[in-house]
Structure formats: structure tokens, C-alpha cells
Amino acid sequence: MLGMIKNSLFGSVETWPWQVLSKGDKQDISYEERACEGGKFATVEMTDKPVDEALREAMPKVMKYVGGSNDKGIGMGMTVPISFAVFPSDGGSLQKKLKVWFRIPNEFQSNPPVPSDDSIKIEERESITVYSLQFGGYAKEADYVARAAQLRTALEGIATCRSDVYFCTGYDPPMKPYGRRNEVWLVKA
């Protein structure tokens, strides 16, 4: 676990492969259109809890799996970003449900270790095209909701995105105080 934190703060981590298809800027909102590769992901689903609370419970499970709590007892190293799917309600607030997605590192894509925790599932995910808006700070549910609304407004008349789900992402460990990177991803319809 300390190795993962050290690498996240001072070293390099594997980035989820994507290709920037285009960049845009509208209403002071700069965004990218990206084609994100699919692959195998470790997932944890949480329900009946607000997003921030659900994340505090789900993230340690994923970190333990990545750190070696698996059938092979090996630490895999981090990939970024860690993303979580959120599900909007009418009016823009979020349902009490989320799904954390951690992309298995390339070295383990063909044969990922089996999680020791039964609540973690290994799932194959297709590639997706997203519109991404980056922002800093310690992101909370309200920040993601606000940024998603800004991005939707900026994309009006330009792109059609799914309204039933979007992704919130983080690139940094919780103890990194400055230069934090978060993104909201709207999925192209």
C-alpha cells in the first residue's frame, strides 16, 4: 500500500489508454472528446448511500485488491484515473448508487488476479467515447454535479450525451494536497 501511495505522489502510474479526438472551448469551459479503451476492470457497486459516503466505503476495497488482497497475493500497481459511474435523478441530483471502476493494469489484463473480497467483480468493459472536463481540488459530490451541469450546457447543440449515467474521475491519492486532478466524463450517446 505504501508503494502505491509513493508511486502516486512521486512516480509514474499507468494511465487508462485513450485518444483525444477533439478539443473544444465554449462559455469558458474547455473540454476534450476522448475515445477510451475498454478492457478488464475491478468494480464495486454501492447502493443506499450518498455518493461521498459510498466512495469512502468502496475505495479502500479497491485499494486492498490492487495492493495484493487477491488470489495471487500480488500488488498490481495503480492505474489512473479511478472512475465511478453516477446516476442522475430528475433535477440533477444523484441517486444513492454508484459503481467504482478500476482499470486492471496492462500486465494483468489477460489474467487478472481474483479478488479476495466477494464484493469486487472483474468485468469486461467496451471502449467508450466521452467528453471530459478537468478541475482541481478535493472533489465532492456537489463539485461533480456542478461540473457535469456546466459541461452539459457547453455541449448543447454540439454533442448528444447519455442522461442516465456519467463518470467522475480522480487521479490523485487523498494525501496529495496540491495540483489535484479530477474530471467529469459525459458519455457520448
UniProtKB/Swiss-Prot annotation:
Domain of life of the source: Eukaryota
SUPFAM superfamilies, sorted: Probable bacterial effector-binding domain
Keywords assigned by UniProt, alphabetized: Cytoplasm
Pfam families cross-referenced by the UniProt entry: SOUL
Chief site of localization: cytoplasm
Cleaved signal peptide residues: none
GO molecular function, one term: heme binding
Stored InterPro entries: Reg_factor_effector_dom_sf, SOUL_haem-bd
One Gene Ontology term, aspect cellular component: cytoplasm
Entry coiled-coil feature ranges: none
Annotated compartments: Cytoplasm
Similarity comment: family membership: Belongs to the HEBP family.
Domain notes: Forms a distorted beta-barrel structure, with two helices that are packed against the outer surface of the barrel. Porphyrins are expected to bind to a hydrophobic patch on the outer surface of the beta-barrel structure.
Subunit-structure text: Monomer.
PANTHER family in the record: HEME-BINDING PROTEIN 1, HEME-BINDING PROTEIN-RELATED
Function: May bind free porphyrinogens that may be present in the cell and thus facilitate removal of these potentially toxic compound. Binds with a high affinity to one molecule of heme or porphyrins. It binds metalloporphyrins, free porphyrins and N-methylprotoporphyrin with similar affinities.
Name of the protein described by the UniProt record: Heme-binding protein 1
Biological source species: Sus scrofa (Pig)
Taxonomic path: Eukaryota, Metazoa, Chordata, Craniata, Vertebrata
